[in-house]
């Protein structure tokens, strides 16, 4: 799916509804320096999936976001990304403020509640009595919120409502 600003593409993992979504989870390759799309009324979280970090400047404040680390910002924010060590990918959660709620955590062990799991590195998860091995970038949808056990690896676990 093309970015709103036309500067890249994301690969949708899940969303609520049609084109007027309430929440959306996607994996996006970031291959060059440039601005993020301005999305008024949308809260955003992203987690870097690859070893190459992402340098983000959010409303004038710059920080380096490494593999498995998160950046959160409002869709109205002025955000510019740089790829100081080459292309990388991020897993992003976008939630329409006031219409839905959502959160994303990074987990390497333990049990967590979630609806969507995206592997950052090769990972083994347990859900609904079964084990699943996920390659980097693989995702699984658990349906309604359920307990997800992370046996090994590093994953993004997303909880959204409705």
Language model regions located:
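Jelly-roll (double-stranded beta-helix
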Residues: 1-162
């Amino acid at each position: 799916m093309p970015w709103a600003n036309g500067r890249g593409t994301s690969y949708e993992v899940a969303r609520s509804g049609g084109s007027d979504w309430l929440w959306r989870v996607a994996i996006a390759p970031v291959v060059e320096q440039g601005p993020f799309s301005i999305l008024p009324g949308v809260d955003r979280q992203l987690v870097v999936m690859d070893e190459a970090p992402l340098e983000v400047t959010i409303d004038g404040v710059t920080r380096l976001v490494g593999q498995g680390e998160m950046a959160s910002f409002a869709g109205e924010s002025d955000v510019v990304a740089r790829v100081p060590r080459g292309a990388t990918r991020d897993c992003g959660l976008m939630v329409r403020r006031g219409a839905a709620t959502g959160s994303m955590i990074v987990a390497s062990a333990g049990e967590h509640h979630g609806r969507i799991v995206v592997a950052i590195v090769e990972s083994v998860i347990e859900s609904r009595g079964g084990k699943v091995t996920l390659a980097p970038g693989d995702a699984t949808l658990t349906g309604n919120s359920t307990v997800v056990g992370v046996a090994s690896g590093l994953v993004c676990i997303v909880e959204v409502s409705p």
